Every structure is written in C-alpha cells, then in structure tokens.
Amino acid sequence: MFGGLSSWLGLKPPEGAAAEGEEPPSRDGDKLSAGAAPSEESPERPVEPTEEQQQQPPTEDPQFLHQAKGLGNYLYNFASAATKKITESVTETAQTIKKSVEEGKIDDILDKTILGDFQKEQKKFVEEQNTKKSEAAVPPWVESHDEETIQQQILALSADKRNFLRDPPAGVQFNFDFDQMYPVALVMLQEDELLSKMRFALVPKLVKEEVFWRNYFYRISLIKQSAQLTALAAQQQASGKEEKSSNRDDNLPLTEAVRPKTPPVVIKSQLKSQEDEEEISTSPGVSEFVSDAFDTCSLNQEDLRKEMEQLVLDKKQEEATALEEDSTDWEKELQQELQEYEVVAESEKRDENWDKEIEKMLQES
C-alpha cells in the first residue's frame, strides 16, 4: 500500500518490496522446474495468483508517474522556498527589533503601530494644554501694589540656595499644587536666568523638583503678604490724616473767634489746662491689642508734633502780647508820675515867687 503511494508521488519503490514481488514467480518456476516431468504428461492448468500477487497493486502508467513526480517536486520546492523566505523575514525582523532595542529606537517601531498613533495624539494634546496654561500664566509680581519692589525682592531669592533647600516652618499651612504652579514656574525660568542655573545645580542632586518649587513659592508668598500689609497700613495712615485735617479745619474758626475776647490771665490758665489735657491725651493709653496701640501712635505722631508746635507758638505770642500790655501800663503809670511831679514843682516855684514878692512889698513899706 505504501509502496503504491510512494510510486504515485514519484518516489522509487523500496527494494524489499520489489524483491518480494518477484519472489512468487521464481518459486513457481522452481516448482515447475521440479515438476517438469509431470506437467508434460498432464494437460496445462491455469496458474492461480497467490495472495501476495492479489495484494500487490496493478502496475501504473510511466507517464502518469512522471507527472506525479514533477508535481511533487514543484510542491516541495515551493514549500521549501516559502519556508526559507518566512525564516529569513522572521530572522530579519528579530535582528531589527534587537538592534532597535539596543540603540534605544523602540519608539520608531511603536510609532508605526496603532499604539504609536495614540501616543502621538496624547502627546499633542498635553502640549496644547501646557501651551494654553503657559500663555495664561504671568509672573507673581504682576498686578501687585508695588510691582517694581516686589519684582526686585523675588529676583533676589535666586541668589541664595537656602531659599530652595529650607522647608516651610512646622505648623505653617501652605497649600502647594505643583501641577497648578507648573506654568508659573516655566515663566519664572524664562524671566530669571539665575533661577534656571540654581535649579540645574540643585535638582535632583540636593532636592527634588517638587520640593524645590514648593520652597521657592513659599518665599514668594511671604514677600507678597508683606507688601499687602504695608499697603494696608499706608492706606489707614492716609485716611487717618484726612480725617484729622478735616476736623482741624472745622475747629479753627471757633478758636480764632474766641481767642481775642479772652483776657491775658484767662488765656494763660486755659493754655495750662490745654497743655495738661494734651499731656493726658498723649500719654499711652491701655489698649486691648498691641497692634491697635501701634497704629494710633504711628498715625498721630506727626499730627501731635504739629499741634504741640502750634501751641508753643501761640503761648509765645500770648506772652509777648501780655508783656506789651504790661509795658504800656508801666509807661502810662510813669507818665502819670511825671505829670504829677511837674505839677508839684510848678506849685513850689509859684510859692517861692509869692514869698519873694511879699518880702519886696515889706521892704518897700
């Protein structure tokens, strides 16, 4: 059976099979040769095929066998060529992947796949978001009360690396979101060259990226809070000055109208009482908070100084007027005394004349 199949595919039949197929005739021939004498005498009988001959397939056509052999060779060659090409392709792909992995070019391979396209779109989306955030971000000193001063103080932070290495004090609540402040950090790297150099020197050798920016923005928040407090104190001081100036303007006409009508002695007593009141008012009062006392002192110091100077000037003027009035009274009294002296002298002269005339009259008589 297998011999017929191999002969149909164009392969040579095995020699053992051929020998087995040839054995029966030789045996029959031997038998016939051994029994040659009886066969001559008896009539010829048909030779019956043996079991092996019955099982042996019939002989095939040589042309058909040649075609089958050519077809088998063609299929074998085609399969061999295809297998060789597939093997070479797989080997080449494996070598390319190995080489790309060694050279770090695995991204080039991934870019050619669906995963590479997805990564490209994701990267593009992230870049667009970062661009929008960076365009909207501005330096911390923008829209501040005193931009120039705050800018100089913030830029001065980059000169000392301790501002980046020291963490905020324990217990201080400072909420820092690195993703939210990342665009501002990019803007600051563009604005401050010294900051970029400091970041290159410290990150990640001495401090992590997130800790570096947290400490930096904590110092910036302190600078901005200090500027806000200074501006608030200046506004309070200006409003206090305006209120006091308006109150002073309202009180000036009354004092000017009353002052000339008062006598000098009463003015001195009033001045003393006013000075006592000013001393009492300028004495530090008890306040609930130290900040309240500090604000009142800082706001009223200049006004109190001006008022004291005005009071001293008024006192000097009043003393001068009192002295002038005293001098005029003294002059009047002196003039009166001189007039009385002249009257007495004239009366004495008149008396002497009368005496002389009386003596003359007595002598003549």
Swiss-Prot record:
InterPro entries: BSD_dom, BSD_dom_sf, BSD_domain-containing. The modification Phosphoserine is found at S283, S298, S327. Keywords: Cell membrane, Cell projection, Cytoplasm, Differentiation, Golgi apparatus, Membrane, Phosphoprotein, Postsynaptic cell membrane, Synapse. The keyword Cytoplasm applies. Residues 172-224 form the BSD domain. The modification Phosphothreonine is found at T262. Residues 52-62 have a biased composition (Low complexity). Induction: Up-regulated during adipocyte differentiation (at protein level). Disruption phenotype: Mice appear normal and healthy. Display no alteration on the survival or axonal elongation in primary embryonic motoneurons. Show no alteration in total AKT phosphorylation in primary embryonic motoneurons. One of its GO terms (cellular component) is Golgi apparatus. Residues 1-65, 237-259, 344-365 are annotated as: Disordered. Its main location: cytoplasm. Expressed in the liver, kidney, skeletal muscle and in white and brown adipose tissues. Expressed in the cortex, cerebellum, thalamus, hippocampus, braistem, olfactory bulb, spinal cord and striatum of the brain. Expressed in most neuropil regions containing glutamatergic synaptic terminals. Expressed in the CA1, CA2 and CA3 perikarya of the hippocampus. Expressed in neurons and Purkinje cells (at the protein level). It comes from the Eukaryota. It is found in: Cytoplasm, Perinuclear region; Golgi apparatus; Perikaryon; Cell projection, Axon. One of its GO terms (biological process) is positive regulation of fat cell differentiation. Residues 240-251, 346-365 have a biased composition (Basic and acidic residues). Phosphorylated. Phosphorylation increases in a mTORC2-mediated manner in response to epidermal growth factor (EGF) stimulation. The keyword Phosphoprotein applies. Plays a role in adipocyte differentiation by promoting mTORC2-mediated phosphorylation of AKT1 at 'Ser-473' after growth factor stimulation. Interacts (via phosphorylated form and BSD domain) with AKT1; this interaction is enhanced in a mTORC2-mediated manner in response to epidermal growth factor (EGF) stimulation and activates AKT1. This is Synapse-associated protein 1. It comes from Mus musculus. The lineage of its organism: Eukaryota, Metazoa, Chordata, Craniata, Vertebrata. The gene is Syap1.
